[in-house]
Amino acid sequence: SNESSADAYLKQSSQTDGLSVIAVSATEGISADTLDTIEAIGYGNTDKLENGTPVIAVGSPLGVIDSCAFGNIGYIDDSEMSTDCLQYAFYCELASNAAKGSFAVDYNGELIGVASSQKTDVALNSAVTRFVGIDSVERVIQSLTAGSKKPLLGIMGIDVDFGMKYS
């Protein structure tokens, strides 16, 4: 870290996913040496995740920038209902502040998920964090990076139970 900084601007954001892409001008404020040292994080394989897999939360899991937390995956839902889609979600036994921006990486340092507070039942248990798998948000990230907004209908499906079916 060479302690350099540059002004950034919001390129695009998605309210439904809680994701934003910021951009920095490569020609203003960042030296060529600094640009040469910047590497993109690799994406991990969420298909290999299972209960008990160790996870590192980075970003601001404790509500403070540059903090980290450690935990294990306690539950995986590969088709959790969300607005306009099904998402791969996993729940970890670690305290995290999704609103402050937290990400899950595996022990290889690859990105496997983004903390999300959309499910209110998880918010009641501060020792559990819901992460949306990187495979579920990769297209959203690519769209936001290109400056496009995510198309949204605003539909969220629910399971039809016995009582609903026969009422």
What would you call each of these model-derived segments?
Residues 45-48, 102-103, 108, 167:
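A short glycine-leucine-enriched loop at secondary-structure breakpoints
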Residues 26-40, 69-128:
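Active-site region of chymotrypsin-like
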Residues 6, 48-51, 65, 69, ...:
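Stable alpha-helical elements in mature extracytoplasmic
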Residues 57-60, 78, 109, 142-146:
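Sec-exported extracytoplasmic/periplasmic mature domains
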Residues 8, 111-167:
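C-terminal cap/linker of serine protease catalytic domains
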Residues 1-59, 63-64, 94, 98, ...:
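Conserved active-site neighborhood of the chymotrypsin/trypsin-like protease fold
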